[in-house]
Amino acid sequence: MKGTLLLLALLVTGELGFQRTEACIPFFGVYLGILSGNRIGLHTELAPFDPTVEEKEAFEKIQDCYEEEGLKAKTEDMKLMTTILFSSECRSYYTKEVLKNILVKFSKKLTHGS
């Protein structure tokens, strides 16, 4: 599952022509939308990309996989993503502002759940 998310992030980054720092915040928004288990939250995060019906269904299937695996899998995956995000390599690459925006997104998702 983690590999799938990484592949999707790389595809979105390459396909849309974003610089990695520009794609970082939208990626984490979609990622958290998936983890939320809330279809409306997921669709809200996907909306700026104007996804096709098939693309929405693909993200919904990923969301379903997380739901089937339960809270433990979600928590472990979030720990992994947090470890990667705040590794010395990422901290040296991303600006403090980008990291702050990602933290805000994480906090909102954890507080509000959508």
Swiss-Prot record:
Expressed in lacrimal gland. Pfam families: Feld-I_B (PF09252). Coiled coil: none annotated. Disulfide bonds: none annotated. It is found in: Secreted. InterPro entries: CH2-like (IPR015332), Secretoglobin (IPR016126), Secretoglobin_Domain_sf (IPR053723), Secretoglobin_sf (IPR035960). The keyword Mitochondrion does not apply. PROSITE patterns: SCGB (PS51311). GO terms for cellular component: extracellular space. Residues 1-23 form the signal peptide. Its main location: secreted. It comes from the Eukaryota. Keywords: Secreted, Signal. Belongs to the secretoglobin family. This is Secretoglobin family 2B member 2. It comes from Mus musculus (Mouse). The gene is Scgb2b2.
